[in-house]
Amino acid sequence: MPCVQAQYSPSPPGSTYATQTYGSEYTTEIMNPDYAKLTMDLGSTGIMATATTSLPSFSTFMEGYPSSCELKPSCLYQMPPSGPRPLIKMEEGREHGYHHHHHHHHHHHHHHQQQQPSIPPPSGPEDEVLPSTSMYFKQSPPSTPTTPGFPPQAGALWDDELPSAPGCIAPGPLLDPQMKAVPPMAAAARFPIFFKPSPPHPPAPSPAGGHHLGYDPTAAAALSLPLGAAAAAGSQAAALEGHPYGLPLAKRTATLTFPPLGLTASPTASSLLGESPSLPSPPNRSSSSGEGTCAVCGDNAACQHYGVRTCEGCKGFFKRTVQKNAKYVCLANKNCPVDKRRRNRCQYCRFQKCLSVGMVKEVVRTDSLKGRRGRLPSKPKSPLQQEPSQPSPPSPPICMMNALVRALTDATPRDLDYSRYCPTDQATAGTDAEHVQQFYNLLTASIDVSRSWAEKIPGFTDLPKEDQTLLIESAFLELFVLRLSIRSNTAEDKFVFCNGLVLHRLQCLRGFGEWLDSIKDFSLNLQSLNLDIQALACLSALSMITERHGLKEPKRVEELCNKITSSLKDHQRKGQALEPSEPKVLRALVELRKICTQGLQRIFYLKLEDLVSPPSVIDKLFLDTLPF
């Protein structure tokens, strides 16, 4: 036997790694072997590692003493090529012993602390005699108090580079310093082993004053089996038979555990016990979080543009339209669908929808401001810029104004009918009854247009049905005169009615009587005011939405009227109107009501004349609107 040591004597010269020989076949050169190369597999039960080492086998020798167990410096040699492969004898009840005793390993300045054994030394013949390739621990006499357990250090990360340390293996025929990592065998042959290198420092005395184990940590890697990878002793031994090199493992009377690989900064209780912590799931990369929809086309929109949450496409379209002052024409009936798929079909309807949802044209930089990212020119700030903390107070007036303009343009006839237009003396041809019937027909057509127009005013449909009907019937004559005055070319005696019919003044004189001259004068005065379309839209809405006798909820009607007035004031305050329009609109309302009184007088006269019985709807409207 090449190494024999006494129990309490220093190690003989032949037991050190510098003079260790085995026969005459091996040299005594000192080398630094490469540490084990690890092949890691992530499994569902934990982290398994397949280790292949460059030494074929290693062994320690010990002497049997019934009352002492002390680890001596390792004497390692190489097995002859013809010798049998070392096997590993597993402990059959190591899980129970592991749970009953908490063992800690303190690795500091290249030494180990003394531990109390958890199982008495082997006494049976089967447990006492093991192959020469096994490692034994025997209890040392309790000359000094045992050192209390220290918390284990966190295991080195797999990414850390293993430092070089002097080894105690003599190269021989079976040892190749350039040996490559052996590919992993079958899943059953993989052995979960954790290697923790020791820094190349000389041993230091125990910090607690106790004797440390006489085991050189640079001689071999510290081995530890996690509990999660433990299995029956027989199956483990059979699985390890196919390993390229036999790895001796001592009976686990004292366990040196290392925390397994974890993804957290500090080891948890489960990692200290060798259990595999649950791996965190990858973050959920949801593409729809935090995004809204475009108010114009319904596409994805991340932020607001020009006061409204819109997509990049509608933002660019609106900006180009405003900067170029482009004018679009709808080839259909001005109600084309605007969505993600069909938003490029009609530019007119797309731009009108941009305005209706509240996009502000004044926010778009003009040609003189293109490319500037600084401050806008100093001018009176709009309420939108002065009070950004509020939820956008000017938005309701802007939305109301756009809706009123859209309602007025929709009520305008698209095609003019000149089929009955006759400016000569033949215009007076026909009987009086025919002219009166024509007068009634034009009034009836105006009622239908007024009803569809009123339903497009924001907030009107929220009123009670009774109030809606009362407001429309009370203002039908005012709306009739106002639309006729806006569309007609009274300077040439051309009157354009709600259904698109164009008649000369002489063609209408026998049915309208003197009321037609009052309408012509009002039209000339209104057109001389140079009101823009926004002011005309507000004038039309205010002529209907006003205080009337018999309303069920007059407060709500008053609130709606105030919103329309605020829209007109806001339009004037921004300087968009050519001239101050609010006083002109109020004066026009007063004149309009006077003209409507003359219209009621004309209907009353035709009823008395009784040439043609009026339609039921005209008769009812006449009776409901009488001031007495």
Curated annotation (Swiss-Prot):
Free-text note regarding domains: The AF-1 domain mediates transcription activation. The N-terminal region (1-292) directly interacts with the C-terminal LBD (380-627): the interaction is potentiated by AF-1-mediated recruitment of NCOA2.
Source organism (scientific name): Rattus norvegicus
Chain intervals annotated as zinc finger (NR C4-type): 294-314, 330-354
UniProt lineage: Eukaryota, Metazoa, Chordata, Craniata, Vertebrata
Region (Interaction with KAT2B): 381-628
GO function terms (MF aspect): cAMP response element binding; DNA binding; DNA-binding transcription activator activity; DNA-binding transcription activator activity, RNA polymerase II-specific; DNA-binding transcription factor activity, RNA polymerase II-specific; histone acetyltransferase binding; nuclear glucocorticoid receptor binding; nuclear receptor activity
Subunit details: Interacts with SIX3 (via homeobox); differentially regulates the transcriptional activities of NR4A3. Interacts with NR3C1 (via nuclear receptor DNA-binding domain); the interactions represses transcription activity of NR4A3 on the POMC promoter Nur response element (NurRE). Interacts with TRIM28; the interactions potentiates NR4A3 activity on NurRE promoter. Binds DNA as a monomer and homodimer. Interacts with PARP1; activates PARP1 by improving acetylation of PARP1 and suppressing the interaction between PARP1 and SIRT1.
CDD domains, alphabetized: NR_DBD_NGFI-B
Protein name: Nuclear receptor subfamily 4 group A member 3
